Amino acid sequence: MTAAPELRPKSWIDSIAPYIPGSSKTLDGRPAVKLSSNENPLGTSLKAKEAYREAIDSLSLYPDSGATALREAIGACYNLDPARIIHGTGSDEILHLAAGAYAGQDDEVLYPRYSFSVYPLAARRVGATPVEAPDDDYRCSVDALLKAVTPRTRVVFIANPNNPTGTWITRAEVEKLHNGLPRNCLLVIDQAYAEYLDPECDDGALALAKNTKNVLVTRTFSKIYGLAAERIGWAYACPEIIDALNRIRAPFNVTIAGQKAAVAALEDQAFIQNSFKHNKKWRGWFENQMALLSNAGIRVIPSSANFTLLLFEGSLTAETAYKALMDHGYTTRWLPGQRLPHALRITIGSEKHMQDVAGILTSLVRQAL
């Protein structure tokens, strides 16, 4: 007698490595300073915290599924039409929605090497083929992306600034990429770290989305706004794209407390400016300290985000540095799972944290010589 077939997941799931979040504990289980998830070291705006607390009496209620007040606040802050804004459970949800709405079986989803790990996952979830274009020394190569476009390409993802490298491409490069894509291809510009860019480095993505029919720009409240726990993202595009994504978006996907906290966070631009200044100062200081170790094989990839990527190309390995920092109570992001076993991504933390990490790495380099 033939055995009954067993329940099995789709075959492509076996090829997906489970996501490993940044650790908040050392290898032996001790609490650690977490410099592995690119969270805001200044925490959260006091105004956002107060708005969150005030939402406690609404726990029995469903949230506004359209997040009207939040979309209006985003529109006011960024000078955008609220009707062309969609909200999500983090920007991750919107990235998945974009792939689901515009790609599928026999289609291709294109992205640069060394970019956000969600992009290939979003492609596979909808049966599309993920296609990786070569980078240019840890930076997105527009020419390589355009060369990789085929008649099957339906979605192109880029992160600007990029994660995990921290590099960015210019407005002219973004425009070149868009101009080189067919009109039936959706360009998704993931701007999770855009608020850390100097104003003169604006890549023009929101303006491009405002004036075109095939550009989607995503942003998040998890980074500079300090609301990572609430998982709130948003995106901007033409009405047709927003309508398509809203049709497949889960209802009630952002909590009442999260919506209220995000509105308050947008209104507290003093906190945002303080976060920006702190990050710029200590990222610059840390990168300068690490540049002093270049003769020992430590290479700094200049960052425009709230983290720095270090390449270990000498006798000191990234794995050794990762474990040593753990021993000193600091968790960072070692990246063998992203084919960067020679790299550490280090979140910009407090003044003390950055001084400690710089001192530890300097001592390790001297010991390895």
UniProtKB/Swiss-Prot annotation:
Gene3D superfamilies, per database record: Aspartate Aminotransferase, domain 1, Type I PLP-dependent aspartate aminotransferase-like (Major domain)
Pathway linked to the protein: Amino-acid biosynthesis; L-histidine biosynthesis; L-histidine from 5-phospho-alpha-D-ribose 1-diphosphate: step 7/9
Residue list for modification N6-(pyridoxal phosphate)lysine: K223
InterPro entries listed in its UniProt record: Aminotransferase_I/II_large, HisP_aminotrans, HistidinolP_aminotransfase, PyrdxlP-dep_Trfase, PyrdxlP-dep_Trfase_major, PyrdxlP-dep_Trfase_small
GO-annotated molecular function: histidinol-phosphate transaminase activity; pyridoxal phosphate binding
Catalytic activity entry: L-histidinol phosphate + 2-oxoglutarate = 3-(imidazol-4-yl)-2-oxopropyl phosphate + L-glutamate
Single Gene Ontology BP annotation: L-histidine biosynthetic process
Enzyme class: transferase
E.C. no: 2.6.1.9
UniProt cofactor(s): pyridoxal 5'-phosphate
Keyword set, alphabetical order: Amino-acid biosynthesis, Aminotransferase, Histidine biosynthesis, Pyridoxal phosphate, Transferase
Activity at various pH: Optimum pH is 8.0.
Name of one Pfam family that matches: Aminotran_1_2
Assembly: Homodimer.
HAMAP family, sorted: HisC_aminotrans_2
Recorded family membership: Belongs to the class-II pyridoxal-phosphate-dependent aminotransferase family. Histidinol-phosphate aminotransferase subfamily.
Purpose of the protein: Catalyzes the conversion of imidazole acetol phosphate to histidinol phosphate. Can also transaminate aromatic amino acids and histidine in addition to histidinol phosphate.
PANTHER family noted in UniProt: HISTIDINOL-PHOSPHATE AMINOTRANSFERASE, HISTIDINOL-PHOSPHATE AMINOTRANSFERASE 2
Protein's UniProt name: Histidinol-phosphate aminotransferase
Organism: Zymomonas mobilis subsp. mobilis (strain ATCC 31821 / ZM4 / CP4)
Record lineage: Bacteria, Pseudomonadati, Pseudomonadota, Alphaproteobacteria, Sphingomonadales
Gene: hisC
